[in-house]
């Protein structure tokens, strides 16, 4: 799970980005899953970044986990090594022009809160 902080309300790429692999839970209270804009700045999460990469026809792999918190930030190193290897082999080494999206949902899992304010993101990281 990660995000890009941008001084401005839109994420602007100076050039075509390198292939990216993104893992993110849609209930992350530490890092925005999509985007939050406030006072002329933006905090752009994995879902938003993946959408921009798709619009630019730039290779990426986005693994989204429904109802998952920031725990997804470390989980891929244990549970997704095959996907990481495939990403590195196909998109980085072989330069295959692929856009891959995987949505993981646990059947019967309860819905959790998914919308957070900028103040809540700051508090969860620094207070």
Residue ranges and their predicted role:
Residues 13-17, 35-38, 77-78:
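Short, glycine/charged-enriched secondary-structure capping and boundary segments
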Residues 1-16:
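Primarily recognizes the serine-hydrolase "nucleophile elbow" in alpha/beta-hydrolase
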Residues 54-127:
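C-terminal catalytic histidine-bearing segment of alpha/beta-hydrolase fold enzymes
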Residues 29-45, 72-75:
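Conserved alpha/beta-hydrolase "acid-adjacent" motif
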Residues 14-20, 56-59:
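Short, proline-enriched alpha-helix->beta-strand connector loops that line the catalytic pocket
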Residues 21-24, 28:
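Short beta-strand/loop motif that positions the catalytic acidic residue
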């Amino acid at each position: 799970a990660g995000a890009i902080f941008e001084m401005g309300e839109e994420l602007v790429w100076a050039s075509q980005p390198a292939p990216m692999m993104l893992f993110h839970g849609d209930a992350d209270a530490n890092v925005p899953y999509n985007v939050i804009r406030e006072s002329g700045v933006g905090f752009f999460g994995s879902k938003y970044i993946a959408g921009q990469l798709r619009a630019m026809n730039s290779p990426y792999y986005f693994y989204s986990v429904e109802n998952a918190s920031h725990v997804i930030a470390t989980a891929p190193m244990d549970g997704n090594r095959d996907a990481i290897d495939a990403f590195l082999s196909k998109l980085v080494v072989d330069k295959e022009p692929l856009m891959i999206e995987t949505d993981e949902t646990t059947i019967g899992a309860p819905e959790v809160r998914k919308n957070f304010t900028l103040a809540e993101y700051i508090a969860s990281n620094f207070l």
